[in-house]
């Protein structure tokens, strides 16, 4: 079964996230566990945690289908010692919040070398940061998100992802979330079933398909290899509808959280419906009614 959802709002408290997901017909969801634009936030209240867990249960959302995302402020490969220390502490705090919610994964962007250190040194810092967080926590898997390769951000190539994983000591608690827009912008073609198969085969050869824990489903505003992270609605960008048909029909992607981060949140319910139709049959025109 495919588990499609979206990155939903936590306005009013994290306990509202599963309610928002249910409203749009999601079978998975992503969320921030705090204000992602602040380094520190109040601890999660016991009542919020209890209500979150109950709402997840009522909505049929299991921990393996929920993908928390850390703050965009965090840079686990920062070349600046004070910012690296702050990022590591914030990342561990996010791990603790995820554990308290009873969840199993924390999705994060690898990091940026800021043109101050060599990329290999930055990758080592990222792996070291992950090791430190895993050592101080007990059950959350650190899920690395591939990037578009914009600016000095690392994690565009499968080689980058493999390098980080190779240096993570507990291989049972590290994984990857593949973002389709980032893949495409980073030079990995997924526009047809054959192209998707080739890209997944390459991922398996270099990283290992066993590490694939989730996907972000986004079309792309920019062409293949642009290195620009510009999301578009499903079927309306440069990737196209055939790619998402192939994803929705690919058996290796069953039971993974498939999370929309497309720009029109008001259209998520419609996009989720479209994706589930794609799972059943070839749809050439995104305007085709159910």
UniProtKB/Swiss-Prot annotation:
Class in the EC hierarchy, top level: hydrolase
Binding site for Zn(2+) 2: 145, 179, 216, 261
Domain of life: Bacteria
Classification via InterPro entries: AP_endonuc_2, AP_endonuc_F2_Zn_BS, Xyl_isomerase-like_sf, Xyl_isomerase-like_TIM-brl
UniProt protein name: Probable endonuclease 4
Family classification: Belongs to the AP endonuclease 2 family.
EC number: 3.1.21.2
Organism lineage string: Bacteria, Pseudomonadati, Chlorobiota, Chlorobiia, Chlorobiales
Sites where the protein binds Zn(2+) 1: 69, 109, 145
Catalytic activity: Endonucleolytic cleavage to 5'-phosphooligonucleotide end-products
Binding site for Zn(2+) 3: 182, 229, 231
Keywords associated with the record: DNA damage, DNA repair, Endonuclease, Hydrolase, Metal-binding, Nuclease, Zinc
NCBIfam families for the chain: nfo, PRK01060.1-4
Protein task: Endonuclease IV plays a role in DNA repair. It cleaves phosphodiester bonds at apurinic or apyrimidinic (AP) sites, generating a 3'-hydroxyl group and a 5'-terminal sugar phosphate.
Biological processes annotated in GO: base-excision repair
Gene Ontology molecular function, alphabetical: deoxyribonuclease IV (phage-T4-induced) activity; DNA binding; DNA-(apurinic or apyrimidinic site) endonuclease activity; phosphoric diester hydrolase activity; zinc ion binding
Required co-factors: Zn(2+)
Underlying gene: nfo
Cofactor note: Binds 3 Zn(2+) ions.
């Amino acid at each position: 079964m495919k588990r499609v959802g979206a990155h939903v709002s936590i306005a009013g408290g994290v306990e509202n996230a599963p309610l928002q997901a249910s409203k749009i017909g999601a079978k998975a969801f992503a969320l921030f566990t705090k204000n992602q634009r602040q380094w520190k936030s109040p601890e999660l209240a016991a009542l919020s945690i209890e209500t979150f867990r109950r709402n997840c249960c009522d909505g049929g959302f299991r921990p393996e289908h929920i993908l928390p995302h850390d703050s965009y402020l965090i840079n686990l490969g920062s070349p600046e010692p004070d910012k690296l220390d702050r990022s590591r502490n914030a990342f561990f705090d996010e791990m603790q919040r995820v554990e308290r919610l009873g969840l199993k994964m924390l999705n994060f962007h690898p990091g940026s070398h800021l043109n101050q250190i060599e990329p290999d040194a930055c990758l080592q810092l990222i792996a070291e940061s992950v090791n430190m967080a895993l050592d101080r926590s007990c059950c959350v898997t650190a899920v690395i998100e591939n990037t578009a390769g914009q600016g000095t951000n690392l994690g565009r190539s499968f080689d980058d992802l493999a390098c980080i994983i190779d240096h993570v000591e507990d291989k049972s608690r590290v994984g990857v979330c593949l973002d389709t827009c980032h893949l495409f912008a980073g030079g990995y073609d997924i526009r047809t079933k054959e192209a998707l198969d080739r890209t997944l085969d390459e991922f398996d050869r270099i990283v290992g398909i066993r590490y694939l824990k989730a996907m972000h489903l986004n079309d792309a505003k920019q062409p293949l290899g642009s290195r620009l992270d510009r999301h578009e609605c499903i079927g309306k960008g440069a990737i196209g509808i055939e790619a998402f048909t192939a994803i929705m029909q690919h058996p290796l992607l069953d039971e993974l959280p498939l999370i929309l981060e497309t720009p029109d949140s008001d259209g998520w319910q419609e996009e989720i419906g479209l994706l589930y139709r794609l799972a059943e049959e070839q749809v050439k025109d995104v305007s085709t009614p159910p």
